[in-house]
């Protein structure tokens, strides 16, 4: 609800201002036409607040700035929440997406994020401070990010596990 006579739109803009945007991968494609080469760009963008909310967006455009802007908008629409236990994840999880497999393991306090560059970026923007990750298989950044998001979505807190077991 709106507080202190602020509109819901202003509240949403304020919440979005807390988000950090990171360009993870840019690809330039060229098409040979009669007049020469025509370039187009694709961009993979991450958006996170460092408090457990993270999103990614993939967009294409003829101009690089347009691809980045569209990717950021797609990332904001694709936000998910990440369950944490303190500074780490609740349990170990392995996920395969296309050719990429990602293994996430909880780590003790003070370990830091031990992961490859693309997986590390996702985990850091999600606000996870202590985790070990291993990327197996494909090194395609898009598939790595999608596999990492699948892994994050499969994470359950202790309370959710207890509810499922009926304890």
UniProtKB/Swiss-Prot annotation:
UniProt keyword annotations, A-Z: Ribonucleoprotein, Ribosomal protein, RNA-binding, rRNA-binding
Signal peptide feature range: none
GO BP, one annotated term: translation
Molecular function per GO: rRNA binding; structural constituent of ribosome
Top-rank lineage group of the source organism: Bacteria
One GO cellular component, as annotated: small ribosomal subunit
PROSITE patterns reported in the protein's UniProt record: RIBOSOMAL_S5 (PS00585), S5_DSRBD (PS50881)
Record flagged with keyword rRNA-binding: yes
A Pfam family matched in the record: Ribosomal_S5
S-S bonds: none
Domain S5 DRBM: 19-82
Signal among keywords: no
Function comment: With S4 and S12 plays an important role in translational accuracy.
Domain notes: The N-terminal domain interacts with the head of the 30S subunit; the C-terminal domain interacts with the body and contacts protein S4. The interaction surface between S4 and S5 is involved in control of translational fidelity.
Oligomeric form and interacting partners: Part of the 30S ribosomal subunit. Contacts proteins S4 and S8.
Similarity field: Belongs to the universal ribosomal protein uS5 family.
Name of the protein this chain belongs to: Small ribosomal subunit protein uS5
Species assigned in the record: Protochlamydia amoebophila (strain UWE25)
């Amino acid at each position: 609800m709106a507080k202190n006579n602020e509109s819901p739109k202003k509240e949403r803009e304020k919440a979005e201002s807390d988000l950090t945007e990171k360009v993870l991968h840019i690809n330039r494609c060229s098409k040979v036409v009669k007049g020469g080469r025509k370039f187009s760009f694709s961009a993979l963008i991450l958006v996170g607040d460092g408090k457990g909310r993270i999103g990614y967006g993939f967009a294409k455009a003829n101009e690089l700035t347009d691809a980045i802007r569209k990717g950021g908008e797609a990332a904001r629409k694709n936000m998910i929440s990440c369950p944490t236990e303190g500074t780490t994840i609740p349990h170990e999880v392995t996920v395969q997406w296309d050719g990429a497999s990602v293994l996430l393991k909880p780590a003790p306090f003070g370990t830091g994020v031990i992961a490859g560059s693309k997986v590390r970026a996702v985990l850091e923007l999600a606000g996870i401070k202590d985790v070990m990750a291993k990327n197996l298989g494909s090194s395609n950044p898009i598939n790595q990010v999608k596999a990492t998001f699948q892994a994050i979505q499969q994470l359950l807190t202790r309370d959710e596990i207890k509810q499922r077991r009926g304890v």
